[in-house]
Amino acid sequence: MSKLVRPHGGGELKPLLLTGDALSAEKARAASLPQLKMSSRETGDLIMMGIGGFTPLDGFMTKSDWQGVCDGYKMTNGLFWPIPITLSTDDESIKDGDELALVDAETGEIMGTMKVTDKYTIDKAHECMQVYKTTDMEHPGVKMVMAQGKYNLAGPVKVLSTGNFKEEYGEQFMTPAETRAKFEQMGWSRVAAFQTRNPMHRSHEYLAKIAIETMDGVLVHSLLGALKPGDIPAEVRSEAIATLIDNYFAPNTVIQAGYPLDMRYAGPREALLHALFRQNYGCSHLIVGRDHAGVGDYYGPFDAQKIFDEIPKGSLETVNMNIDWTFWCKKCGGMASQRTCPHTKDDRILLSGTKVRAMLSEGQDLPVEFSRPEVAKVLQKYYAGLSAEQNVKVELKGHSAA
């Protein structure tokens, strides 16, 4: 009997990726079906369904699911879900009952098939207000929703591919079944997920080590899908994180892995989604720091912590591990948090993303109190290869790694 948290919904993992003869047969059938091009976000969502990360979904959401999730975190069947998982199109001719091949618009690869059970329109501004708390087109998540097609399509899917994530990231691209097997092998049952879309600096290292003190282990779980233009690419982040783990974490306390979603930058709602799919990966806790999954000033620094107290009790088995803002304090002589350090901001070493970017692009060393030298070297190498124009666009934001 597994001691790990159960997958979301309380049943078994439900990966929708076909294998063997079923995969060969469906691929052959898909080749003759009308094609629907998916955005990067939609492709990532489909792959998550394929590997079981979005258990127990069996496809893209219906209008009543969309409405229920937007307005009350609940699908029609009563399942807790914090963000709509939808597929859109501008194609007027598609109708209920149609069978479609789902194609990654960027690569042209057929990623899955779908039987359309519902074609509907939505109030995009309503989704933005409910999920992102704003309709400001400067918000990358709002921009993404507003760029969707005129219609949403719902229906069960069969997944045929996970794209090139395995080829690009090798063992780091782990499915929920694989992380669960690894946790079992390690004898772990209390596992904290550390969500990251950035390289890990000293403050992130400190957060993970706080969790290690009370947990069996930590899953450092990096986003491998698309970010905002200018964010550091996943392969560079992965190398920087691996370098930190190899040099500064005790053996058998951390597993590094990645997942295929794009960032939505939905702040509190995205923190709930992060906890939900970490439950499928086998994690009992999600570390939630300052400004988790946020962007700009759209959310309060700890809104993503507060939202866990606002959802119905028992919605998720994976629970939040709240940790305050962390930094190096000169007077304390080490890493500290707002909760433990009595000193003023003048005693704290805080670097803005702009400052970090400027130092790295000029080949300067970052303060050792801010970043480990081995990590800084990985980033310096990346920045050295950028043109001046690219350099301006690269962003390192927020004190949270999320």
Swiss-Prot record:
Keyword ATP-binding annotated: yes
GO MF annotations in UniProt: ATP binding; sulfate adenylyltransferase (ATP) activity
GO term, biological process aspect, one: sulfate assimilation
Signal sequence range: none
Membrane-spanning residues: none
Keyword Nucleotide-binding: yes
UniProt KW keywords: ATP-binding, Nucleotide-binding, Nucleotidyltransferase, Transferase
Gene that produces this protein: sat
Family statement drawn from the similarity comment of this UniProt entry: Belongs to the sulfate adenylyltransferase family.
EC number: 2.7.7.4
Protein name: Sulfate adenylyltransferase
Organism encoding this protein: Thiobacillus denitrificans (strain ATCC 25259 / T1)
Pathway: Sulfur metabolism; hydrogen sulfide biosynthesis; sulfite from sulfate: step 1/3
NCBIfam families, alphabetized: PRK04149.1, sopT
Reactions catalysed according to its record: sulfate + ATP + H(+) = adenosine 5'-phosphosulfate + diphosphate
